[in-house]
């Protein structure tokens, strides 16, 4: 396709946003839909300390479109409190970014192109996470990353990895 580069194709590139500063999703006088609030609480739990784990996080598929519409519809109702004002000014904008990130991390793609990490010594929280979530691949972060990126790819999609001969020396 000779016109590929002239099309408005947006790559899905992002830095991971954590939810460590968000204590809870619900806010009295603002959030009132239990189903949507449950999605918000899930996202807060899922992205706690997320920078340590990065794109390896398994994000469940929810109706994030409906959740985004819910976030866009939220307004202050009733008595204005310090908590509700803080929530609307601070938490709400963060949740809009987080749901966009969740959409990217729960979708499947026609093309996945990346540069896997080349470290085989895992420590701390990352080591614990890899053992729990990716046990068959726990020996090397490179293997875990390759597996996860095949998961991001559609069945008939393409995967491209920047992989020098390091793979020959994986233990």
What are these regions (language model features)?
Residues 1-171:
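SAM-dependent methyltransferase catalytic region
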